[in-house]
Curated annotation (Swiss-Prot):
Superkingdom of the source species: Bacteria
Protein family: Belongs to the UPF0229 family.
Disulfide bond sites: none
Protein species of origin: Escherichia coli O9:H4 (strain HS)
Residue spans of biased composition, Basic and acidic residues class: 79-90
Biased segments, Gly residues type: 92-102
One Pfam family per UniProt: DUF444
Upper taxonomic lineage: Bacteria, Pseudomonadati, Pseudomonadota, Gammaproteobacteria, Enterobacterales
Name this protein carries in UniProt: UPF0229 protein YeaH
């Protein structure tokens, strides 16, 4: 019986390198599946893992096959139904076996279902927020916001095969073999010198010569038994996440909770803010978040009240903007903080208040913030607030606005608002 002894120190997750390669190869299909899956989740279940399905034809492997040209003769099993030049009808409906569940039942045909596999929470969030960043982030005097980046950190004795250092492993192998065989090689060299002297001496010393030859053979066998490479020699490139200091930042979340916002609209707004919160907490450290709810009056609240409070009322959007301006002046000096804001509303506002919102943003907030995003969640025609904000968008580069009609628009809009920009930071 043959026994295999696994001496690897990293016995767990032995197929991790294959899994990572698979995720890289089919990233486009996986991201498409994730963008579709996120719309089906509840607000509280956004950050868990996910079952991802990929069409079978998208994961087909390259293969060699015969070309279509040329003259070929083949021998096929005989049958009593078809003769040469007969045409075989294509199966109808589901008979083709595509696995999609479409069409009618058939007694023949075959195919494969979509490939389904599970990704972890970390893999899910990495793909969810890939290529996203806070726009116009500038390094200020006080650095408390920390972004983690991967850096080389020497070598380690365990790791995945993809990170193995061939040169360092061979150097360790040479050093080990030299250390283990140095004494034997010196002894071998001395025996070979003695053998040469005895072989040339007169009279011949056959017994002594035979003994030396036997010892030399044993020493050479011992030296050859030292393995060329051992798990002890293996070295892997080590990577670690190091804090990369950046500028401190604050995000203002302004949510309309007026009576015109029905429950489904509020749920879509909450989904957007949950994505924003996960993105900030996943990508940056020590980002401060200020939550503001407003109807006719605005109030700064904590995270729990922001997402779960049932308070409602009329609509005066400027109350939230005024409160944000007060908080900025009181706690967040624009010279030391990167200030961001994300506002969500259904666009329904008191008509006389919309010009005031334009004035507050243009004169007080937009000159001091790095980026201000506005999303309007409605299926109705845009009203005065949207039109006032359109003037701001044409004037200020750090103002962006998007329209969300239904749940499927949330994630694409979020990526559009926070995709990485190559533009230089605002001074």
């Amino acid at each position: 019986m043959t026994w295999f002894i696994d001496r690897r120190l990293n016995g767990k997750n032995k197929s991790m390198v294959n899994r990572q390669r698979f995720l890289r190869r089919y990233k486009a299909q996986i991201k498409q599946s994730i963008s579709e899956a996120i719309n089906k989740r509840s607000v509280t279940d956004v950050d868990s893992g996910e079952s991802v399905s990929i069409p079978t034809e998208d994961i087909s492997e390259p293969m060699f096959h015969q070309g279509r040209g040329g003259l070929r003769h083949r021998v096929h099993p005989g049958n009593d139904h078809f003769v040469q030049n007969d045409r075989i009808e294509r199966p109808q409906g589901g008979g083709g076996g595509s696995g999609s569940g479409q069409g009618q039942a058939s007694q023949d045909g075959e195919g494969q279902d979509e490939f389904v596999f599970q990704i972890s929470k970390d893999e899910y969030l990495d793909l969810l927020f890939e290529d996203l960043a806070l726009p116009n982030l500038k390094q200020n005097q006080q650095r408390q916001l920390t972004e983690y980046k991967t850096h080389r950190a020497g070598y380690t004795a365990n790791g995945v095969p993809a990170n193995i250092s061939v040169v360092r492993s061979l150097q360790n192998s040479l050093a080990r073999r030299t250390a283990m065989t140095a004494g034997k090689r010196r002894e071998l060299h001395a025996l070979e010198e003695n053998l040469a002297i005895i072989s040339n001496s007169e009279p011949a010393q056959l017994l002594e010569e035979e003994r030396l030859r036997k010892e030399i053979a044993e020493l050479r066998a011992k030296i050859e038994r030292v393995p060329f490479i051992d798990t002890f020699d293996l070295r892997y490139k080590n990577y670690e996440k190091r804090p990369d200091p950046s500028s401190q930042a604050v995000m203002f979340c302004l949510m309309d909770v007026s009576g015109s916002m029905d429950q489904s609209t509020k749920d879509m707004a909450k989904r957007f803010y949950v994505l924003l919160y996960l993105f900030l907490s996943r990508t940056y450290k020590n980002v401060e978040v200020v939550y503001i709810r407003h109807h006719t009056q605005a109030k700064e609240v904590d995270e729990h009240e922001f997402f779960y409070s049932q308070e409602t009322g009329g609509t005066i959007v400027s109350s939230a903007l005024k409160l944000m301006d007060e908080v900025v002046k009181e706690r967040y000096n624009p010279a030391q903080w990167n200030i961001y804001a994300a506002q969500a509303s259904d666009g329904d506002n008191w008509a006389d208040d919309s010009p005031l919102c334009h004035e507050i943003l243009a004169k007080k907030l937009l000159p001091v913030v790095r980026y201000y995003s506005y999303i309007e969640i409605t299926r109705r025609a845009h009203q005065t607030l949207w039109r006032e904000y359109e003037h701001l968008q044409s004037t200020f580069d750090n103002f962006a606005m998007q329209h969300i009609r239904d749940q499927d628009d949330i994630y694409p809009v979020f990526r559009e608002l926070f995709h990485k920009q190559n533009a230089t930071a605002k001074d």
